[in-house]
Amino acid sequence: MVFLKNKVKKKLILGIDFGTTYSLLASVQNERVVLLTDDKKRYLLPSIVNFNKKKPLIGWEAEKKIIKDPINTITSVKRLIGRSIDFIKKEFPILPYVIEDNKDGGILFHTNSGLVTPIDVTSEILKFLKEKSCEFFNKKIDATVITVPAYFDNLQRDSIKKAAISAKINLIRLLNEPTSAAVAYGLQLNTEGLVVVYDLGGGTFDISVLKLNKGIFEVLGTAGHANLGGDDFDTLLSKYIYKKLNLSNQCDNFFQSLLLKKAKEIKIKLTKYEKVEVNFFNWKGIIFRDEFNLIIKDLIQKTLFICSNLLKEIDLKIESIKEVIMVGGSTRVPLVYQEVKKFFRKSPLISINPDQVVAIGAAIQSDMLMKNTIQKRTILLDVTPLSLGIEVMGGFVEKIIFRNTPIPISKTKEFTTAKDNQTIIVIHILQGERELVKDCISLSRFILKDIPSKKAGVVRILVTFEIDTDGLISVKILEKFSHKEKKIQIENVTFLQNKNIHKIIKESTINAKEDYYLRVRKEKKIESKYILDLLNNALQEDRNLITSEELKKIKSHQIKLQKSIDEDDFFSMKLNLKKLEEVSKNFLSLRLKKNMDSFSIKNLSDEIT
């Protein structure tokens, strides 16, 4: 239990660890965190729903149906929520369910209860958890914090929120799982310094580096893999067993479910014993822990590779890390503990049950948000996992909020029009680390119409990005002259590409140099074209301000610059642009003086009249 200095109980709060495999409930009661259990004293609730022609079965009752009714029994929905059908078919080619594309985004499950979405499935689980909590305390729950992986994207987070609303839960915050674990340990240990949270659950892996200082939890960086966890251990082990069975035919849904269940049982036993006797269909034998270690070693190394990349990215040496916290049921696997200990060169903390620590942190944070506790509130500074920006001329991405920026955050940048008399602006919102639009994730597009018709560069557009404490994004655009404004919340975007975030960051690092030079070259080309257009327009209006000799020189250098543009010769373009600016200096100076004189005469005329 985690003890808190709290004398007055004001409201009944709840922390929900919504897990891929299991979910947990916790609440602060009488100065301590209490983990809620069922009538059989089990604190783990399987995140499973069985849809039948009557009332859906949830949890342990639903788990009994996995083998008998795999098509209607939805497991690990957390891996599917907020995902497109293309992503799911690619990442999970063998699923026991019948699914189809949902026109509103995501997928639909075909069940005995009809078509249901991952949000519906999640809502049933959350509703069940809420009901069990009300029964446990015999009163209504006032507020709830739900935890999510740090690498859940905007669509996934929004889907969890919608599921909570559907379950009639008063959700006061979505809390990143690694941060939640740090809340639990931070309050218990009262430590200060750099802490790594290694979170390996059933379906996701996250690593977060946090700086703890006087009640402030600042997330310095996060990384992870949205599809790497204990479920993958089970899958690899089931394939290993399948080979031993020597079966020629492909397994059906029923056999596949049975095989996965057996693999999971063996995995759990191997966390305690060096060997396990197996009697499955036509095969009897022994599986040793060493065999299992060989099967899963590459996956564990993959998590450590992600850890290594994050430490390099935030320029942190292993020696400066004070503590390593282990979170998630999959960290019970002995090899995981051994490899993490070896990598970080220190024994990870496991004094709080890895299964329970996230729920404990959620309960503590929920209690503090509702101001039930008299102690100083902990300040959580989470970060955004990927940079956000908009498309600008040339197919570039202008980043407005950068990766690993603490949230909540609001940031504004000023832009202008690219063409004369432009009355419409299309804002294309993007997420990612690359320089070009084609290499980033498209989140949304929206249009601001009827802006003042003026010359290019005159109109001023303010673009504001906001990310709230739950990591949800909103974008506002304001045209300063007419005060026209438009704001959108990035929600269920059906064309959102659910790429693996670790892959995006890795690709941006590999291509950083090439992307930089490509952008510099393209920007120089755009600048050169822009200068040529401006100069041509100016000469049409005021060529009488200069001698024919000066005009000839300018025209000559214009031709040279145009040739450099056509040949896409960067260095020639750079040189010729500089020379054109030099020979045009006198003309532009005379033109500016003329315009200033005209402006003064007009003002004087206005005063006289």
Swiss-Prot record:
Pfam families: HSP70. SUPFAM superfamilies: Actin-like ATPase domain, Heat shock protein 70kD (HSP70), C-terminal subdomain, Heat shock protein 70kD (HSP70), peptide-binding domain. One of its GO terms (biological process) is iron-sulfur cluster assembly. Keywords: ATP-binding, Chaperone, Nucleotide-binding. It comes from the Bacteria. One of its GO terms (molecular function) is ATP binding. InterPro entries: ATPase_NBD, Heat_shock_70_CS, HSP70_C_sf, HSP70_peptide-bd_sf, Hsp_70_fam, ISC_FeS_clus_asmbl_HscA. HAMAP family: HscA. PANTHER family: HEAT SHOCK PROTEIN 70KDA. Belongs to the heat shock protein 70 family. Chaperone involved in the maturation of iron-sulfur cluster-containing proteins. Has a low intrinsic ATPase activity which is markedly stimulated by HscB. Involved in the maturation of IscU. This is Chaperone protein HscA. It comes from Buchnera aphidicola subsp. Schizaphis graminum (strain Sg).
